[in-house]
């Protein structure tokens, strides 16, 4: 019984380590053309402005509104990725699914700690905005590829 519990704990710890490391590696990859600002402006998304505000001193009361705004941006980008008129519509890659799971965990953590540990909430919000930037770049590259195909036709 003790050995089973030990194996379960160690396996869970290794899975969490792998998950975090994989998410960090995915977020560190940057595409050559950065489409995130254009996608954010075109779709009225606020993650770019929120990221800029988070790099300055922020009042604790505004963290909750930032979290809600990022969740709204997440829903919009997820909808766009799932319904874009490309060959990849409705399908998410493994990387995108990992980032979606991480976003939901970060949103939950942010909601739980924003009053008691504002710096931890700020860190979670910054990572949430990085995930949204990744999704915006994916969306922008899909649109650019589609525009390139239309120009060749």
Language-model features, listed with the residues they occupy:
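Cytosol-/stroma-facing membrane-proximal "stalk/adaptor" domains immediately downstream
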Residues: 90-153
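Short, charged/polar, low-complexity loop and linker segments
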Residues: 44-58, 76-89, 113-115
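Generic structural signal for well-ordered, non-membrane alpha-helices
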Residues: 44-45, 68, 72-79, 107-108, ...
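Short, solvent-exposed segments of well-ordered alpha helices
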Residues: 53-68, 89, 119-126, 130
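Elongated extramembrane "stalk/tether" segments
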Residues: 25-72
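N-terminal signal-anchor transmembrane alpha helix of single-pass membrane proteins
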Residues: 1-34
């Amino acid at each position: 019984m003790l050995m089973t519990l030990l194996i379960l704990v160690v396996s869970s710890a290794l899975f969490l380590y792998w998950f975090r490391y994989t998410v960090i590696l995915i977020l560190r990859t940057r595409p050559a053309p950065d489409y995130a600002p254009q996608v954010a402006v075109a779709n009225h998304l606020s993650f770019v402005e929120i990221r800029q505000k988070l790099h300055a001193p922020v009042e604790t009361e505004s963290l909750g509104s930032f979290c809600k705004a990022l969740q709204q941006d997440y829903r919009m980008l997820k909808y766009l990725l799932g319904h874009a008129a490309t060959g990849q519509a409705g399908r998410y890659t493994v990387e995108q699914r990992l980032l979606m799971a991480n976003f939901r965990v970060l949103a939950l953590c942010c909601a739980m700690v924003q009053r008691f540990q504002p710096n931890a909430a700020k860190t979670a919000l910054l990572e949430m905005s990085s995930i949204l930037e990744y999704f915006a770049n994916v969306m922008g590259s899909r649109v650019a590829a589609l525009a390139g195909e239309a120009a060749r036709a």
